[in-house]
């Protein structure tokens, strides 16, 4: 895809010179066609739909031209932050969360404040499977049908979209091109899953052991409901542990402040409800602990995906408790392999199946192709060719590391 000059300038500023598989595939069809984009968490779905839509914006037309619907305030703030950064290179671009503005691109929740503009030609639903849940499906259908009056192109994106949900989308929007870059819906190649055997001790003792073991890392602790979260935060406060909590009962300003602090690497332990399991990028976090398992099975994949963002490894822990066995059995049948961890009496952790060798960085298909291209350039053996070849490959990895925080989107 050829991007207009402002977007080229932005990509150059962020040192983005290659695109992920989902981005490359979506660029071929969106926004000329209705598209469903499915790819694992942290693969770059946001840029997959955002860059092509921005590429079509006419800044001389002071009317809304594209809208992105998201299911949570946190995801809305995250996308608006990205757009505000893009605006530095995109003179004249206006973005907003309000439909009563003349912004070119609107990022919004689904609600009563939606205003239909005939100039809106591109409509995206991010984390679309959340809109397809029973409690919000009717509102989503009404929203889609409202915008269909002016025949825009639709984009639907998620990390977990099953056949039944895909059929629900097809009933509302046709024709539809499906771009599926996730062949194994329940597995993420960069997440290591661990099952913590408490050996008769309390779950909180296990949590303390995990926090101690990962004392140099940032940790997300997920709770499935408000009662569970309140109980856990009380225990943490009673034990004088430093943490922040983020949940739906906070005011919007409180939620935004805590979310921004976590995104800016100033929070080590963040206790959250499942509202943060979807689409949120917290690049500094590398550990997820499920204090209890989510009510919706697929949310476990989204929880663990918070710490495996575009070629970075993540660890996800679950407690081996009787009331978790039913869901754990279902996860196992879906192909999730849990490594066994034991809580010792002295509060330490034993990893009998964990190799202590340093994990090798994951290599994307694009990077593999670039490495092959370098090696192919040395068909004739010349003095010091191995040294030069090794240096070129090292520079590739260095560039990837420099780009990683932005390629997460």
From Swiss-Prot:
Chain residues that bind ATP: 39-46
Nucleotide-binding among keywords: yes
Keyword tags: ATP-binding, Helicase, Hydrolase, Nucleotide-binding, RNA-binding
Motif (DEVD box): 126-129
Statement: the UniProt record of this protein carries the keyword Hydrolase: yes
Enzyme Commission code: 3.6.4.13
InterPro entries in UniProt: DEAD/DEAH_box_helicase_dom, Helicase_ATP-bd, Helicase_C-like, P-loop_NTPase
Record-annotated Helicase C-terminal domain positions: 190-349
GO MF, one example: RNA helicase activity
Signal peptide, first to last residue: none
Domain Helicase ATP-binding, chain residue ranges per copy: 26-179
Reactions the enzyme catalyzes: ATP + H2O = ADP + phosphate + H(+)
Database matches in SMART domains: DEXDc (SM00487), HELICc (SM00490)
Cited PANTHER family: RNA HELICASE (PTHR24031)
Family, as annotated: Belongs to the DEAD box helicase family.
Name assigned to this protein: Probable ATP-dependent RNA helicase MG308 homolog
Organism expressing this protein natively: Mycoplasma pneumoniae (strain ATCC 29342 / M129 / Subtype 1) (Mycoplasmoides pneumoniae)
Upper taxonomic lineage: Bacteria, Bacillati, Mycoplasmatota, Mycoplasmoidales, Mycoplasmoidaceae
């Amino acid at each position: 895809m050829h991007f207009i000059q402002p977007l080229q300038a932005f990509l150059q500023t962020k040192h983005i010179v290659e695109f992920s598989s989902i981005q490359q595939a979506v660029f071929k069809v969106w926004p000329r066609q209705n598209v469903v984009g499915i790819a694992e968490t942290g693969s770059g779905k946001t840029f997959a739909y955002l860059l092509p839509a921005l590429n079509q914006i006419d800044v001389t037309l002071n009317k809304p031209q594209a809208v992105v619907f998201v299911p949570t305030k946190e995801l809305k703030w995250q996308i608006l932050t990205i757009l505000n950064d893009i605006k530095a290179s995109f003179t004249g671009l206006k973005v907003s969360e309000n439909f009563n503005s003349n912004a070119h691109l609107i990022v919004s929740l689904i609600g009563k404040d939606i205003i239909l503009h005939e100039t809106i030609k591109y409509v995206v639903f991010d984390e679309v499977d959340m809109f397809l849940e029973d409690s919000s499906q009717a509102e989503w259908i009404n929203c889609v049908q409202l915008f269909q009056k002016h025949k825009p192109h639709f984009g639907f994106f998620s990390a977990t979209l099953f056949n039944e949900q895909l059929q629900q989308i097809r009933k509302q929007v046709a024709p539809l091109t499906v771009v599926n870059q996730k062949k194994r819906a329940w597995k993420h190649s960069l997440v290591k899953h661990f099952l913590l055997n408490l050996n008769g001790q309390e779950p909180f003792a296990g949590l303390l052991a995990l926090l101690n073991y990962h004392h140099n890392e940032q940790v997300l602790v997920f709770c499935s409901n408000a009662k569970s979260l309140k109980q856990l935060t009380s225990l943490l406060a009673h034990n004088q542990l430093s943490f922040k909590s983020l949940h739906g009962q906070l005011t919007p300003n409180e939620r935004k402040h805590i979310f921004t602090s976590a995104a800016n690497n100033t929070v080590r332990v963040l206790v959250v409800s499942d509202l943060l399991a979807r689409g949120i990028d917290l690049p500094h976090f590398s550990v997820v602990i499920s204090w209890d398992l989510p009510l919706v099975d697929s949310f476990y994949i989204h929880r663990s995906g918070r710490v495996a963002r575009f070629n970075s490894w993540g660890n996800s822990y679950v407690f081996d408790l009787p009331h978790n066995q039913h869901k754990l059995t279902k996860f196992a049948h879906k192909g999730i392999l849990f490594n066994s961890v034991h809580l010792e009496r002295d509060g330490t952790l034993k990893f009998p199946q964990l190799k202590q060798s340093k994990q090798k960085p994951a290599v994307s298909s694009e990077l593999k192709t670039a490495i092959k291209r370098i090696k192919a350039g040395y068909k004739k053996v010349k003095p010091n060719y191995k040294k030069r070849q090794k240096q070129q490959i090292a520079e590739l990895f260095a560039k990837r590391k420099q780009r990683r925080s932005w390629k997460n989107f």
